């Protein structure tokens, strides 16, 4: 029974992927992933990224967001990316493979950032999905809390934060926490997000420090 369910789910994902105009466009343009279009749409609306900025990208692999960000911040800017998974190199992007929940990895990440402060913290992190919302949602909320804690450590005053969050238990409390730390907070659902997905992006500007 479970095997049939898994097969049906896999078939649906494959059909969506190959019928997906964003996935097709990403392949055509040589982008790392369709996720790049989500950040592109957020950038068009909120103008988070500017030339010369320093950006931290959490959960970076396969590199779509880093690829887009370095294209905006340019040679005078910096993108520092981190992920548990490997990521092929991107010109201008400093990538650290590891779990930043571990002290040694966090220290290595902070060493790459400091003594500078960061203009934008980005997180497209998501947990491995178990298929059980009572397990998946707390895992997802734990990751977004970690991303917010990274802001507390490295984000410059008036800096910006964009994070993928799954709507569900803990979502409203999290948004309230972000509002306490930033002057302006918006919830975005990019067109390139799949309609059935619970993901939204919390976009926060004007870090109070």
From Swiss-Prot:
Q: Which reactions are catalysed by this chain?
A: uridine(2552) in 23S rRNA + S-adenosyl-L-methionine = 2'-O-methyluridine(2552) in 23S rRNA + S-adenosyl-L-homocysteine + H(+)
Q: What keywords would UniProt list here?
A: Cytoplasm, Methyltransferase, rRNA processing, S-adenosyl-L-methionine, Transferase
Organism of origin = Vibrio vulnificus (strain YJ016)
Q: Which Pfam families does this one have?
A: FtsJ (PF01728)
Annotated catalytic residues = 164
Q: Do you know which NCBIfam families this protein is assigned to? A: PRK11188.1 (NF008390)
Q: Which PANTHER family match?
A: RIBOSOMAL RNA METHYLTRANSFERASE, RRNA METHYLTRANSFERASE 2, MITOCHONDRIAL
- Write out the function statement from the record: Specifically methylates the uridine in position 2552 of 23S rRNA at the 2'-O position of the ribose in the fully assembled 50S ribosomal subunit.
EC code(s) of this entry = 2.1.1.166
Binding residue positions for S-adenosyl-L-methionine: 63, 65, 83, 99, 124
Q: What class of enzyme is it?
A: transferase
Spell out the HAMAP family in the cross-references: RNA_methyltr_E (MF_01547)
Family statement drawn from the similarity comment of this UniProt entry: Belongs to the class I-like SAM-binding methyltransferase superfamily. RNA methyltransferase RlmE family.
Q: Which domain of life is it from?
A: Bacteria
Kindly state one GO CC term assigned in the UniProt record. Answer: cytoplasm
Q: Does this entry carry the keyword Transcription regulation? A: no
State what protein this is by name: Ribosomal RNA large subunit methyltransferase E
For molecular function, the Gene Ontology terms on record are: rRNA (uridine-2'-O-)-methyltransferase activity
Q: Which residues form the signal peptide?
A: none
Tell me yes or no: is Cytoplasm among this UniProt entry's keywords.
yes
Q: Corresponding gene?
A: rlmE
Q: Where in the cell is it found?
A: Cytoplasm
């Amino acid at each position: 029974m479970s095997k049939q369910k898994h097969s049906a789910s896999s078939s649906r994902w494959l059909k969506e992927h190959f019928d997906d105009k964003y996935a097709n466009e990403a392949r055509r343009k040589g982008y790392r992933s369709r996720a790049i279009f989500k950040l592109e749409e957020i950038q068009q609306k909120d103008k988070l990224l500017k030339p010369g900025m320093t950006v931290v990208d959490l959960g970076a692999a396969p590199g779509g967001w880093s690829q887009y960000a370095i294209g905006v911040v340019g040679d005078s800017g910096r993108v520092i990316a981190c992920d548990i998974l490997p990521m092929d190199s991107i010109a201008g992007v400093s990538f650290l493979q590891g779990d930043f929940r571990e002290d040694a990895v966090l220290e290595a990440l902070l060493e790459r950032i400091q003594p500078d402060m960061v203009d934008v913290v980005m997180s497209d992190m998501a947990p491995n999905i178990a298929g059980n919302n009572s397990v998946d949602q707390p895992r997802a909320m734990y990751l977004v809390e970690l991303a917010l804690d990274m802001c507390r450590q490295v984000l410059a005053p008036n800096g910006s934060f964009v994070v993928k969050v799954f709507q569900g238990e803990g979502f409203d409390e999290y948004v309230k926490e972000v509002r306490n730390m930033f002057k302006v907070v918006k919830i975005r659902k990019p067109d390139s997000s799949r309609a059935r997905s619970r993901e939204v992006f919390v976009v926060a500007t004007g870090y109070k420090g």
